[in-house]
């Protein structure tokens, strides 16, 4: 038996192809994911950012076991998503992962109070058996998310931010290894969004829940240590954020962007790089001692650049 991956989320060469019908009635294949690779280790808080049509929603559907990939590898919380039966998928969604969706109607039952919504999640998942244990767990979760004042309120009586924080409490009621959030701030203003994201950071930090936020909003990346950009069905770049001390002992917040190199050596150049240099079809590469240079195909390669073991190119006479 192969060893289980030590990552909480692992995708290798993930492909998802949909068959759709064109206007003329012909069948057309649409490739939503094109060999996507992603690894998220236990306890990480990661944002996956991408424009509409980039493949991020398809990725989340696969990670939540609501959809199956066409090919590749997908593991979440120690479960192989490609081999699970339907009964195993139901158990996986109830016990191993938690969810926070953009729409309140998907997170909370409108006719139940905040405490009743959390208690219902506990009852469904089998956590905190017994009424007393459930009440204690409900109180703990609402206190953690700072919405204990909403305990007796129904969703229509709460603000958007309060609804989402209660939704997070519902999402972690089953003590999941992984929390998946789909556009959790999509319907909120900037200030409220920041409060909700800080609540997710608090859950990640205090409970150690591996958290993945899928969003189209680049501002979300300011609240996480790692941001993965998806473009054309693949991971294209990553931004890693850290806090360092300068020579005077003052804190500096540093963000470093990296291109993602896949297993066969492919990478996607950022759109602004491509546009700035007017890169098209072919580019020239040059191997330097400590980096690789990229030039537009119509420009001559700098003479100082060399490829190892490559014979000199002679211009035709």
Language-model segments: what does each one mean?
Residues 80, 119, 126, 131-150:
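Conserved ABC ATPase "signature" region
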Residues 179-182:
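Catalytic Walker B motif of ABC-type/P-loop ATPase nucleotide-binding domains
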Residues 94, 153-156, 173-174:
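Conserved signature/switch motifs of ABC ATPase nucleotide-binding domains
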Residues 81-98, 131:
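ABC ATPase NBD coupling module
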Residues 111-120:
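Short coil-to-helix segment of the ABC ATPase nucleotide-binding domain corresponding to the Q-loop/switch region
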Residues 64:
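Helix-to-loop junction immediately C-terminal to a conserved catalytic motif
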Residues 147, 151, 166, 171-172:
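ABC ATPase C-loop
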Residues 72-80:
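Conserved ABC transporter NBD signature motif
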């Amino acid at each position: 038996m192969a060893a289980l991956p030590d990552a909480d989320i692992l995708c290798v060469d993930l492909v998802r192809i949909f068959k759709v019908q064109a206007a003329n009635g012909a069948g057309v294949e649409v490739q939503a994911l094109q060999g996507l690779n992603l690894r998220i280790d236990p306890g990480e808080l990661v944002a996956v950012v991408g424009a509409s049509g980039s493949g991020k929603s398809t990725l989340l559907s696969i990670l939540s076991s609501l959809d199956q990939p066409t090919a590749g590898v997908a593991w979440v919380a120690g479960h192989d998503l490609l081999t699970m039966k339907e009964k195993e998928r139901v158990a996986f969604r109830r016990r191993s992962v938690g969810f926070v969706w953009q729409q309140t109607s998907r997170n909370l039952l409108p006719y139940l109070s905040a405490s009743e919504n959390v208690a219902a999640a506990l009852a469904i998942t089998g956590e905190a058996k017994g009424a007393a244990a459930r009440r204690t767990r409900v109180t703990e979760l609402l206190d953690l998310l700072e919405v204990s004042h909403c305990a007796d309120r129904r969703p229509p009586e709460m603000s958007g931010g309060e609804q989402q924080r209660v939704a997070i409490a519902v999402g972690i009621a089953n003590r999941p290894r992984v929390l998946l959030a789909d556009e959790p701030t999509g319907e909120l203003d900037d200030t409220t969004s920041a409060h909700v994201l800080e609540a997710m950071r608090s859950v990640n930090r205090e409970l150690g829940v591996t958290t993945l936020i899928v969003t189209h909003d680049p501002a979300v990346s300011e609240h996480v240590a790692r941001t993965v950009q998806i473009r054309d069905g693949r991971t294209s770049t990553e931004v890693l954020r850290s806090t360092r001390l300068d020579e005077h002992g003052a804190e500096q917040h540093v963000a470093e962007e990296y291109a993602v190199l896949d297993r066969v050596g492919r990478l996607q150049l950022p759109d602004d790089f491509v546009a700035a240099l007017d890169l098209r079809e072919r580019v020239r590469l040059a191997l330097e001692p400590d980096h690789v240079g990229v030039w537009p195909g119509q420009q001559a390669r700098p003479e100082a650049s060399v490829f190892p073991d490559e014979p000199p190119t002679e211009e035709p006479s």
